[in-house]
Amino acid sequence: MNKNEIETQPVTWLEEVSDQNFDEDVFGACSTNTFSLSDYWGNNGAWCTLTHECMAWCK
């Protein structure tokens, strides 16, 4: 693999999320935790879970 191939490889989902600052970009003054994420995605419960927010069949 040469240098150009390394630089042009796609960014993974985890790398993209890790590079973001959710406290300023999405949630303003809120701290980024499971509760604020859960509220942002419309869950009125106490926990942010992939099964509730991201999977339609689990709602």
From Swiss-Prot:
Residue positions where 2,3-didehydroalanine (Ser) is found in the record: 36
Keyword vocabulary terms for this entry: Antibiotic, Antimicrobial, Bacteriocin, Lantibiotic, Plasmid, Secreted, Thioether bond
Molecular function in Gene Ontology: signaling receptor binding
Proregion residues excised on maturation: 1-29
Location of the protein in the cell: Secreted
Pfam families in the record: Lantibiotic_a
Gene Ontology annotations for the cellular component aspect, listed alphabetically: extracellular region
InterPro entries documented for this protein: Lantibiotic_alpha (IPR029243)
Site of covalent link Beta-methyllanthionine (Thr-Cys): 49-54, 51-58
NCBIfam families the UniProt entry points to: plantaricin
Cited function: Lanthionine-containing peptide antibiotic (lantibiotic) active on Gram-positive bacteria. The bactericidal activity of lantibiotics is based on depolarization of energized bacterial cytoplasmic membranes, initiated by the formation of aqueous transmembrane pores. When present individually lacticin 3147 A1 exhibits strong activity towards L.lactis strain AM2, weak activity towards L.lactis strain HP and no activity towards L.lactis strain IFPL359, but when combined with lacticin 3147 A2 it displays strong activity towards all three strains.
The name this protein goes by in its record: Lantibiotic lacticin 3147 A1
